[in-house]
């Protein structure tokens, strides 16, 4: 049916169009609102885009069994849902709920981005099977998860959970308020983990666990306006010190060299493969003791050349070590 006075069109079986300029051009479809349309244009007629629903001023439904509800809401793929003012769903089986929420990306000519879910005002799930939950969240990588206000997961299979949590790089995990995980390596040199408020981990296979724990050092870039327009070109995290296979466990624990281990509150490692055990412990450069002369006899110690060091305290905060067996002396 066509109403010349309002330019309203319902041109298919069981189609409904209500509102100035509303158009419903496929079977079992509903368009309600000024300029609302279901499969408008010559390319969208017939069964191919059946059972679409567009409700709201300028709402658009272009895909089988899709739903767009809200002023300017739109879906462009099959089985998709867009709910909220200017919500957009461009992913097959995608969901966008919230004002300005986005599921899928605008330039996806091969239709690789599917099953993405964005829930929250300005939430964006641009990666295939990505999930963005919360206001201003961003799941860019495929199979990535961002949950929490302004949480961003930008790497493939990355996870960011917590307000302002940020993960970047394949398999990186950031959990906690302002937690940051950045992997910039290739191949198997990925998968960094930062868990705890303001925890930081960068490099490759490094772990920071605890409030303000650090495995490497990061700088957070906060220019959202620039990043929002160029999500693939501008990074939000910048590595100041990258470390590999480092582990920092404890509040404010810090490892700033490869393969180091800091265990305890404010434990600090600044030497390659160094180990700091206990609160406030800190490593120093290793000192080798190859031998010792006693009563004119020279004794060579096994392991006389030290590769690194283990610290159980620091200057002014020394600890005794108990229940330790005697060391070995070599046969020569």
Question: Residue ranges of each PLM-predicted region?
Answer:
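Glycine- and small/polar-enriched repetitive beta-structure motifs of secreted/surface proteins
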Residues: 1-332
């Amino acid at each position: 049916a066509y109403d010349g006075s309002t330019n309203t069109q319902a041109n298919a079986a069981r189609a409904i169009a209500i509102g100035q300029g509303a158009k419903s051009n496929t079977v079992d479809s509903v368009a309600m609102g000024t300029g609302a349309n279901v499969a408008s244009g010559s390319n969208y007629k017939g069964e191919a885009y059946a059972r679409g629903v567009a409700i709201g001023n300028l709402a658009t439904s272009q895909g089988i069994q899709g739903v767009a509800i809200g002023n300017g809401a739109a879906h462009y793929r099959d089985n998709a849902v867009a709910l909220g003012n200017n919500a957009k769903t461009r992913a097959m089986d995608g969901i966008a709920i919230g004002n300005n929420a986005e599921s899928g990306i605008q330039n996806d000519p091969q239709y690789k981005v599917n099953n993405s879910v964005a829930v929250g005002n300005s939430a964006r799930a641009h990666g295939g099977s990505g999930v963005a939950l919360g206001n201003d969240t961003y799941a860019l990588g495929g199979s990535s998860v961002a949950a929490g206000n302004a949480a961003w997961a930008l790497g493939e299979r990355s996870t960011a959970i917590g307000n302002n949590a940020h993960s970047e790089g394949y398999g990186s995990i950031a959990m906690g308020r302002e937690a940051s995980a950045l992997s910039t390596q290739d191949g198997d040199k990925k998968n960094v983990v930062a868990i705890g408020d303001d925890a930081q981990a960068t490099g490759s296979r490094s772990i920071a666990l605890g409030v303000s724990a650090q495995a490497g050092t990061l700088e957070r870039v906060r220019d959202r306006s620039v990043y929002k327009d160029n999500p693939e070109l501008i990074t939000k995290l910048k590595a100041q010190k990258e470390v590999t296979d480092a582990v920092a466990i404890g509040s404010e624990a810090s490892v700033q060299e490869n393969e180091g281990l800091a265990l305890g509150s404010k434990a600090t490692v600044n030497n390659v493969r160094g180990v700091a055990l206990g609160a406030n412990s800190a490593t120093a450069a290793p000192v080798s003791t190859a031998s010792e002369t006693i009563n004119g006899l020279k004794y060579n110690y096994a392991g006389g050349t030290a590769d690194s060091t283990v610290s159980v305290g620091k200057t002014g905060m020394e600890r005794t070590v108990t229940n330790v067996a005697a060391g070995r002396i070599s046969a020569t």
